[in-house]
């Protein structure tokens, strides 16, 4: 994994728990990030994004008010969304594989289980920056390509050489 300088990034933290918001902000400041905005729920996050040009959003799954899934849906699908292509890392204490799939299926770029450390957060940020997946615009989905790897074709090669 390449080293990234994230000090000039604008990062939005969406988390209803003040202590965890502060924890994430402190980690980001330790990593050199100076421009951080916060929101307590998805609705507030959308309002912040109208005036804050975020390069990345770190969004909690379960919050009072508008939850993380609804927030991501709105960012990806709302016609008034300021940035449908915003890289999004979802953080949660619920780490079941089915929940990670649900997050991926609504347009999250990456998923990080709580508790988080500076190392785990930086690893996810680097993965999102490194893995520039194409965005898919389909009738029932808008977001990063959900396929993580190329599937090997197992059939007969029919191309002429």
Describe the predicted segments one by one:
Residues 18-37:
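Two-component/phosphorelay signaling modules centered on CheY-like receiver
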Residues 130-161:
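CheY-like receiver
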């Amino acid at each position: 994994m390449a080293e990234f300088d994230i000090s000039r990034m604008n990062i939005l933290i969406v988390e209803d728990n003040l202590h965890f918001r502060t924890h994430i902000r402190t980690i980001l400041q330790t990593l050199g990030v100076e421009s951080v905005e916060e929101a307590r729920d998805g609705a507030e996050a959308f309002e912040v994004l109208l005036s804050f040009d975020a390069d990345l959003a770190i969004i909690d799954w379960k919050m009072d008010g508008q939850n993380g899934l609804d927030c991501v849906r709105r960012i990806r699908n709302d016609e008034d969304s300021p940035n449908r292509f915003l890289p999004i890392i979802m953080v949660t204490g619920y780490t079941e594989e089915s929940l990670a799939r649900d997050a991926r299926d609504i347009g999250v770029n990456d998923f990080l289980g709580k508790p988080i450390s500076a190392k785990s957060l930086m690893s996810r940020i680097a993965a999102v920056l490194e893995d520039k997946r194409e965005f898919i615009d389909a009738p029932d989905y808008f977001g990063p390509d959900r396929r993580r790897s190329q599937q090997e074709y197992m059939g007969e090669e029919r191309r002429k050489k």
